[in-house]
């Protein structure tokens, strides 16, 4: 039995207007135009549904092949965390949730390096998912480990070092098609300025609620409202007074801004989300994200505890807001 996930593509020829958008938008060049779109390379399909999502007539259906649902999980497994670290992570999660009143679990993120085993007790999803979708699942309490053949976003997967970059993404062409950027020059600059890990340097992504840790983490991701992000920012600088230089763009939110930048730079970073992350998940429009490198977590948690002694309750009680008076 194969570990691969494959998809079948069905086109409603009666509805199709042969506009060619599916061929232009497909990041992995599944289609050619020959009297309408022809999915000549269905084996290249990632199940991202960019083609069906941009079809003006909803004429395209992308479905996972039944054999993929029965695929065996034969990846090597090992325990990737010790008991002391488990208790530390649980305490971190409890402090953040209790003090900041987070609705969602803080998420532990571990990138599985090439040659490393997968963590014990973590499921591989049967279908492909976007990395940002896996983060949304983890904030709700689900643990997932995803090798490249379970990722459905070629952009995030290549950024995180699981694959190489498809040509349409490497050139920035697809961002022009989406009307996200004005010119090819702007698209090329955006692509060239974002960081990327070495292709094929990573085996998988692993995400889980921090209070149910499955591995040591590279980054902790927190989703919350702007006020909660403010306290995390203040907690990080509680002992230093340092002001933060955040890098946010509206592009590649979870993969670059929440994961890769904090992991690489050893600094916290905020993200407002991105088109793909918001369009493919249930993240609400009042939420934003922060990535915290694990190296900073002890000071962040200590800072949160200190802030909870006075300024957090004072701010939430609105102590400087004049009382409403009626004449």
Question: Each PLM stretch: what is its role?
Answer:
Residues 15, 66, 226:
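A broadly conserved detector of short glycine/acidic/proline-rich loop/turn motifs that flank catalytic sites
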Residues 76-327:
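Acidic, serine/proline-rich low-complexity intrinsically disordered regions
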